[in-house]
Amino acid sequence: MAKAKIAVNGYGTIGKRVADAVKAQDDMEVVGISKRTPNYEAAVAHQLGYDIYAPAENVGAFEKAGMPAAGSVEEMIEKADLVVDCTPGGVGEKNKPLYEKAGVKAIWQGGESHPIAGFSFNAVSNYEGALGRDLVRVVSCNTTGLCRTITPIDRELGVKKVRAILARRATDPNDIKKGPINAIVLHPVKLPSHHGPDVRSVIPHINITSAALLVPTTLMHLHTVNMEVDTDCTAEDIKKIFSSQSRIRFIGQGITSTAEIMEVARDIKRPRNDMWENCIWPESITVDEKEFYFFQAIHQESIVVPENVDAIRAMMELESDGAKSIEKTNKALGM
């Protein structure tokens, strides 16, 4: 079977990780990545052997910088079966006509809204619904983290309601322009935050409300989650369900912070210190009748990366079984 030809439009925090993840698979390949300007990320992409494409008006700038562009973004799109759009939120919507004109499939990230594709994706929740689709949106890091925990609990115990409080990292580690650096910001003041409604774009029947704060850190998000279920359960029941999920990692051995989780990622030699899994403290799982609580940490730079790979596989119909795709992706990444 020929490999699916994938273009990555936007080579930033998510795009560079998606490109490497696609490259690691045996049923898909990267035909090119795009950058607007010949900055350090473009230089690294060039060193890694990726064909770089740029807006037509910027191709000359890449030539002058010593990293000749392989062509325009439009030319890259023409070579692809599917484009993974990893451009900043709002930019992806402007790119949609390019993909439609070229007749290629497209994936957007959670920075775009649900209507851009009409289908929001999470591998464990609705893989089969993405089979053969032309347009898909992979939900954000926080929504991905919530869906990964809600779905297996709902299947085993039935979820009556979810209440989630999200302490969101202020920005990514390489971002020197954003904050806060000495404040906690209500984000937003008016409740709910967008995360609850976004979960429902994937799992429509779930009753969920969310609240979010921005905190002065760049490492990870931290969720405090409360679920009420339909069935009596114990903390051990919840742990058993979570432990059955390959993209949930239990955190222990004295770890009480996101900093220590990132140190674990370094110590196990993850690329870019990535932690693709939800990180849950099993000691935090506390049951009160049919309600339970837990803490989980979400690595915003990487958690959606395997989801993008699975979305590609579903849309290109390379694998019809979601569980098999998840296993294949995980193995290729070394998860």
Curated annotation (Swiss-Prot):
Chain positions recorded as NAD(+) binding sites: 13-14, 111, 169, 300
UniProt-listed InterPro entries: DapB_N, GlycerAld/Erythrose_P_DH, GlycerAld_3-P_DH_AS, GlycerAld_3-P_DH_cat, GlycerAld_3-P_DH_NAD(P)-bd, Glyceraldehyde-3-P_DH_2_arc, NAD(P)-bd_dom_sf
Subcellular location: Cytoplasm
Subunit structure as annotated in this protein's UniProt entry: Homotetramer.
Active site: 141
Pfam family, one: DapB_N
Pathway recorded for this protein: Carbohydrate degradation; glycolysis; pyruvate from D-glyceraldehyde 3-phosphate: step 1/5
Gene Ontology cellular component terms for the protein in this record: cytoplasm
GO molecular function: 4-hydroxy-tetrahydrodipicolinate reductase; glyceraldehyde-3-phosphate dehydrogenase (NAD+) (phosphorylating) activity; glyceraldehyde-3-phosphate dehydrogenase (NADP+) (phosphorylating) activity; NAD binding; NADP binding
Protein family according to the UniProt entry: Belongs to the glyceraldehyde-3-phosphate dehydrogenase family.
Stretches of the chain forming a coiled coil according to its record: none
Residues that, per the record, bind D-glyceraldehyde 3-phosphate: 140-142, 171, 195-196
Catalysed transformations (reactions): D-glyceraldehyde 3-phosphate + phosphate + NADP(+) = (2R)-3-phospho-glyceroyl phosphate + NADPH + H(+); D-glyceraldehyde 3-phosphate + phosphate + NAD(+) = (2R)-3-phospho-glyceroyl phosphate + NADH + H(+)
Gene name linked to the record: gapA
Cross-referenced Gene3D superfamilies: Dihydrodipicolinate Reductase, domain 2 (3.30.360.10), NAD(P)-binding Rossmann-like Domain (3.40.50.720)
Protein name, entry field: Glyceraldehyde-3-phosphate dehydrogenase 1
Organism superkingdom: Archaea
Keywords: Cytoplasm, Glycolysis, NAD, NADP, Oxidoreductase
Any single biological process term in GO: lysine biosynthetic process via diaminopimelate
Species per Swiss-Prot/TrEMBL record: Methanosarcina acetivorans (strain ATCC 35395 / DSM 2834 / JCM 12185 / C2A)
